[in-house]
């Protein structure tokens, strides 16, 4: 499952990233072919790991599943190899998305992290050339800083027309 920059921006305008992750976990669990004997391990994004579990399971159809349990912990990737593997796969998918964006725009966009000088340069170039790219989180503080320095008016907000 991947989430677009637009999905993340819209979540930040609504319930927030924690709820986006809760919904994402729930959707992923709903796709499991078997709902019996499932051991679920999650890296909790909520400050309260148990609440994270409860929110995911609250609307999960037919939960509790037979002989199944869910464990959410902070830094679960350091304790459960399956969570560490999922984290690596997610980072690889993110890297592929960044590479695809670079190929589409025709220049190096860096790693996508705000501390990366190549990412900062790419954001400046994108904002100067065409505004904010669809694959960039518009609500990102780094984007807001560059927009304020190089453009007139407020940073565009997803889902809202500029006047």
Q: How would you name each of these model-derived features?
A:
Residues 1-163:
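RNase H-like, two-metal
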């Amino acid at each position: 499952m991947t989430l677009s920059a637009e999905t993340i921006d819209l979540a930040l305008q609504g319930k927030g990233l924690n709820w986006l992750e809760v919904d994402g976990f729930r959707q992923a669990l709903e796709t499991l072919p078997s709902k019996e004997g499932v051991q679920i391990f999650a890296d909790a994004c909520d400050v309260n790991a148990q609440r994270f579990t409860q929110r995911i399971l609250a609307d999960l159809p037919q939960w509790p599943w037979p002989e199944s349990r869910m464990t959410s912990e902070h830094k679960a990737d350091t304790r459960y190899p399956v969570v560490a593997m999922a984290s690596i796969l997610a980072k690889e998918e993110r890297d592929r998305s960044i590479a695809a964006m670079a190929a589409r725009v025709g220049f190096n966009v860096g790693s996508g992290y705000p501390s990366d000088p190549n990412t900062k340069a790419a954001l400046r170039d994108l904002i100067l050339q065409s505004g904010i790219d669809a694959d960039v989180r518009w609500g990102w503080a780094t984007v807001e800083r560059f927009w304020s320095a190089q453009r007139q008016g407020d940073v565009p907000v997803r889902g809202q027309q500029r006047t």
